[in-house]
């Protein structure tokens, strides 16, 4: 209870709620309250006129009602401006309450004899509406309710106490009034507490939904950015659908297909130019770099190249070590694709020349360009990378390999498309590359018109930089210079600004402040000013607040039917009606308090006939049975040990909370019991057959004035039966989640029954009470305000309409709460799906252990990711026969069907990665028909140094088994495709540097001598064999594998190396093989 009456905390989110609360509930309810009061006052005048009374004969009544009409009309005018109400909420609410209270006290002394039961229903109305309809806090409402109760009791006690005629019955009546008012206060507190709890829950759900929506939008942006960092937009939609299908089918598995092939996302494009560029001298420079320097250097270089590519409408395809290749004319055809690539190549050479001139480091750029047609898309299931394939792509690669450092080497096809834009000279170097020599076509070197100018300008600066750099390592000097280029960091967009907002993140103070400020202004103003001051997230918040406004129920809604409030979706309506209501037992408990109040009142004001006592006893037992069913689970918790035969009892309360049919039956029965017991005392009145006021004797009513009232007739209980009926109306409002149509039916039923009883069948009791009070003929009857049956009927109608308004609003908010919870649940599920999609996309770019470095930790963006490893096993596995198999003809759709087979090979290789035994294998990339993977990358930094050599290289065995599994997969594909492809594998292990480079298309890669040698082991290998270096052979020997020497072979860039073949026919054995060593 202390929490109910404690002052609200001042945080701005609570201020948000207060503003929302006044907008959504209190503003319309206050207007409706004033409207009901005005209608009731008008009804009083109409009833007085309809009952045959002369309005001018009772000037006090007429004056009171007319003044009240004027005063409440003025209050309605003051409250009709929402911003005024928000600014003056408490004073205006207090003024309305004081006006209601003053009107009630005026009614007490207007129209006739003052009695203890006068205006009790009216004061009950004031008490209940102070909680339910006035915009007051719980503490203020409680003060208003108690003050209303005490004022009525004190005024009547002080006024009637000195009168000897009324003194004997005064105390029981005042006690009955106190019970009525206490019950009204309890019902009001209960209603307000539950409504505030429901409203706060709805508000929190709305805020949570807003946060989830923001988070969902952020995740969508992230996954869109990630998807576009892997693929062009035209393929992104198809690939996204593929990933979503994989998510639904289970991570790592591919969805069921209507055919036996994996999905192929490759298309043919004609009229494109392909550029290959290689940094000459970078391998030697990289060997001198620290891991951080190497990754920074590569990121800056390729970041610069990406910028150049963007300027010249080129699209980077891949980074292969220090090799960079891109295309122009994809995904949209461009007429100047050849010129674009040549310009880009020249700009790349210029950038490297400036770098060399500024640092004195001996590096250069070799560029090759060819124009033709390509097959472009992605293959495989993991580590998707947009790639291009065709004979023209192969030729472009050889153009780079056979080119001249610092020059752009082009083919005749490209030259024809330049249309004289650049001067060229004959390359005359076909002898440098066997492929070009075999092709036999002339090639050309583009003459850069600005090269000589730049050389002259850069000579002095280059010499000066070289002298200054003598004291500094070339790699460090180069790193320092490249930092000035300021290339963006990979995944920079995931590290700040638009990072996902958690559901617990508070709204910004700016939004909170602007909310209270803006809504204190006239809302009829154009919202443009508001939109100018708020960002998109804030604007969405205001849209949510508007949706929470209860006035929306009277407007068109896409979720509700405005008349019935039913959900427009039938499934949602069914789900709402079948939803559980755990608080139903508290509805029953509070209704039981109303029943007890009625019982106490009846015992105070009646003669307590035995039949009434028996009826109440039976009803009391029925109530206890209902409460036992509702609270059986709570009762069983109190009894730790009980008979096993009673262990089924807790299920009863669960059934009540979850079964709507049972709830409706119990709720309806409870309300009907309260209604029935409120009027039961009327049927136990001792009556006389010659009573002139009973219906059969109405014609003799005037002539029979000599008839005497029985002295034992407890007529004072008649108005209290009406008051008990009013409490019966209140019992309907206690069932917050009861459907509006059922409440309407019960209220209509009770209104008809009450009016029928007190205006027709038992109206004679009211007439008898008037005769007894006024001791005179009926023509001296009192005013409307003192006639029990008329005031009782007016009270019934007032409570009927008041509770009908509250019932509709309760229904709206119950449904709104359900709707927001459902939306929040759906948005959270969608957000979770998007997060999984983002994670999958990120893991398609980065290894699983690297991805958290860029997302989920709000990582600082100052440093590039890099990691050095002491022992990593690198695998290159190629299908050399595929080059001969690949052809471009009409039969195979210009090579598309050949790529379909390559896609099957790579996809089957990728499927092996999902097996637990190969969880340590990380796919790096594919280069044509070559598959690159590594193990040992998930080890933490320094871990290898802390373990012995045997354990640190244990993952080499995993890689060998993976290589063998690749061969087995290829054998299966050969069997089904009637081919005889064979795998050529190269393995090497040692230290590597891993990192993420490239802001436009972030790419995870590994570098180092280990990688270069592993590549040479594959390219110099033998079909069907796994070739390894001598050091790797010794490591595998220690793990139980058998290797035999191939001898000394010449390896490009490495000289003479002694290599070994792994005996893949043998599994691990105990003793080492003698063939090694």
Swiss-Prot record:
Superkingdom of the organism of origin: Eukaryota
CDD domains: CHD
Cofactor dependency: Mg(2+); Mn(2+)
Annotated tissue distribution: Detected in the zona glomerulosa and the zona fasciculata in the adrenal gland (at protein level).
Annotated membrane topology: Multi-pass membrane protein
Residue spans crossing the bilayer: 29-50, 61-80, 94-117, 120-138, 141-162, 170-190, 586-607, 611-633, 664-687, 715-736, 744-764, 791-807
Keyword field contains Cell wall biogenesis/degradation: no
GO cellular component, one term: plasma membrane
Extracellular compartment spans: 688-714
Binding-site positions, ATP: 278-283, 320-322, 366, 925, 1005-1007, 1012-1016, 1052
Activity regulation statement: Activated by forskolin. Insensitive to calcium/calmodulin. Stimulated by GNAS and by the G-protein beta and gamma subunit complex.
Catalysed conversion reaction: ATP = 3',5'-cyclic AMP + diphosphate
EC number: 4.6.1.1
GO biological process: adenylate cyclase-activating G protein-coupled receptor signaling pathway; adenylate cyclase-modulating G protein-coupled receptor signaling pathway; cAMP biosynthetic process; intracellular signal transduction
Main location (coarse class): membrane
Residues annotated as glycosylated: 697, 704
Keyword Glycoprotein on entry: yes
Record family assignment: Belongs to the adenylyl cyclase class-4/guanylyl cyclase family.
UniProt function note: Catalyzes the formation of the signaling molecule cAMP in response to G-protein signaling.
Record remark on domains: The protein contains two modules with six transmembrane helices each; both are required for catalytic activity. Isolated N-terminal or C-terminal modules have no catalytic activity, but when they are brought together, enzyme activity is restored. The active site is at the interface of the two modules.
Protein known as: Adenylate cyclase type 4
